[in-house]
Amino acid sequence: MSENTEQPLPSTFEEFNEQRKAAFIRVKDYKQAGNRLVGFLCSYTPLEIIDAAGAASVALCGTSDEVIPEAEKVLPANLCPLIKSTYGFAYSQKCPFTYFSDMIIGETTCDGKKKMYELLNELKRTHILHLPQGRDRAYEREGWYEECRLLKEELENFYGITITDDDLRVAVRRRNRLRAAQLEMFALQANQPAAMSGVDLMSTMFAGTFSFDIEAYTQQLEQKVVKLREAYDAGERPVAADAKRILITGCPVGGVINKIGRTIESNGGVVVCMDDCSGERTAAMMIDPEAPDILRAIADRYLDINCSVMTPNDGRMENTLAMCEKYHVDGVVESVLQACHTFNVESARMQEAVEGAGIPYMKIETDYSNGDMGQIETRIAAFIETL
């Protein structure tokens, strides 16, 4: 990527608010300086391979209903809001990360996403990782290893580079350090009372998915953990001692941090554990940087992530129960985005597992609009009152 390559802004740039304009200028300047930028949309994306290509990786999952009307010009209305929002931001050119990315890495998780990627590819080069539907058969693991190899090859060909094993090992060490910092921050919520607002925790983790500099973000997290720990040890208690301790599980929470997370915390609860695909159960999975076949170690780490698209998926329920014990959970709230069939169907098994352990459970099926806010607040308040 040559330096000082002119990066044009969208034709609608002047219509954006100042915050969005500033975001576009920031990413434009980053790209114009010759930097590489790759968008991704799923926790199964092997980020170490992108890192090893010298590219910054940014999450592109849509979390707002702002652009859904634009998306529905192409996509069906009765589709998951995350899918519609993601496509809508690309279609309307309102997301600077999508607009300026060199390419997007998609994956065959749910049916809606994998078909949306065909349309997204018409707007922006999109490479698809073919994720197997399970991982307990040898050919599935071998197939995924090949997908990771093909991603490495795609990035090498696109950028005209060679990604070495040493490059991958450096990337693994950086990501391991980041995940260790995330785990330390998650662990602060095991304190009784919790050391911070769960909304603050979720917002901090969500913001990290837009960072161009892994090491800088890792240092920020490490410093924040130290400050929070020191404040807690000094007697600061930002969370009430009688706040009911809630674990959130289910679909990605980025689009419902305020809708569900803040509602929990304004009704006598505190979110002590994020048990979605960007939470502790995924961050806890490290990679051995000294593994003889480092690419295979990377591939294996990602395939072992628990998600409702996998069959079987017993590990997710087992992990949730372990998190309930670790974080002294009073109740579990499962967030299911409308039309997310895999999480919606699997919620029956989650409810059975959680209630079988003697922990109250509630499922909330919602989208990114505010139309059901009153109903959700009533249900959450009633649920917390029973704990």
Regions of interest found by a model, annotated:
Residues S2-E3, A348-L387:
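Peripheral docking tails and interdomain loops at the edges
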Residues L37-G39, Y44-K94, D102, T109, ...:
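An N-terminal, globular interaction/scaffold subdomain
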Residues L41, L247-T249, S335:
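Short hydrophobic segments within beta-strands
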Residues Q32, I49-T63, E70-A71, C251-P312, ...:
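Redox- and metal-dependent alpha/beta enzyme cores, enriched for Fe-S-associated oxidoreductases
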Residues Y87-N157:
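Acidic/His-rich segments in extracytoplasmic proteins that coordinate ligands and/or metal ions
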Residues S101, C324, H328-V333:
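Proline-aspartate-enriched helix->loop->beta-strand connector
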Residues S2-R36, R149, E153-V271, D275-M286:
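A charged, amphipathic alpha-helical module
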Residues A90, T311-H328, V345-E346:
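A short, acidic, amphipathic alpha-helical segment used as a generic capping/interface helix at domain edges
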